[in-house]
Each structure stands twice: as C-alpha cells, then as structure tokens.
A protein has these predicted regions:
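Short loop/turn microsegments at loop-to-beta-strand junctions
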Residues: 5, 34, 89-91
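Vicinal oxygen chelate
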Residues: 13-15, 60-102, 106-111
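Amphipathic alpha-helical segments
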Residues: 13-28, 72
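Short, flexible helix/strand-to-coil boundary loops that buttress conserved ligand/catalytic motifs
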Residues: 21, 52, 73, 115-117
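Conserved short beta-strand elements that form part of the metal-binding/catalytic scaffold
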Residues: 26-57, 61, 94, 101-108
Length: 118
C-alpha cells in the first residue's frame, strides 16, 4: 500500500531552498545524510535536489490561513506575487532563494486530505 508521496524540487541553490523550508516555513525535517534534508509534508515528503541547467517543478502548498503565511513571508523579506483570486482558491507565487517558484493557495473547494486512510 502507498503511504505517502515524496516530492522533489530540483534547485540551482538547494542549500538556500532547504533553509527557506526549514527556517521560514518551519517544516520539520530529518537529515538523510550529508546535509540532505527531507521535509515532512502532510501527508508527503519534500526534498531539495541540485539541478543542472533549468530547474522545473510545480508545487502548491495549501494554506487555510493564507494571510498569516503571507505575514511570515513579509517578515523574512521573501518575495511573492499575489494574492490573486481564482475559481478554486486564492493564489500566491513565492520566489525561493534559488529563483525557483512555488505556489501557495487557500482552497475554495472541498479538499481530499481527509480521504487517505490513516
């Protein structure tokens, strides 16, 4: 049975992006060795991997209290665009220290998070 997901963000500055998830978003992590942090996500994992050339990904983190998260980003001088309203939620694009981007959104729709058996 599948118990979760492992998300990989390829990064041109993995150390800086790891620090962002650890220090700004305060995601708990385990050290997989040699500084490779694996972050806990409900119910998935998030890892930073170095990239050669163009890095690409699309990751949106769901935030039931988006305004509070934006206040934290502002306090840490993290650049972001938005918020903008979409049919499915309020959307923000966040610039990671490496220059890659992730999205944050506060959903307006029912979520499936509670459907996974625990």
């Amino acid at each position: 049975m599948i118990s979760g997901a492992h998300v990989i963000i390829y990064s041109n500055d993995a150390d800086a992006d790891r620090a962002f998830f650890r220090d700004v978003l305060q995601f708990p992590a385990v050290d997989a060795g040699r500084g490779w942090l694996i972050f806990a996500l409900p119910p998935a994992e998030l890892a930073m991997h170095p990239a050669e050339g163009d890095a690409s990904h699309e990751l949106f983190l769901m935030c039931p209290e988006l305004k509070a998260v934006l206040s934290t980003l502002q306090a840490h001088h993290i650049r972001f665009e938005g918020p903008t309203e979409a049919r499915w939620g309020t959307i923000v694009h966040v610039d990671l220290p490496s220059g890659s981007r992730i999205g944050l959104y506060q959903p307006k729709h029912p979520t499936a998070l509670s459907l996974w058996p625990r």
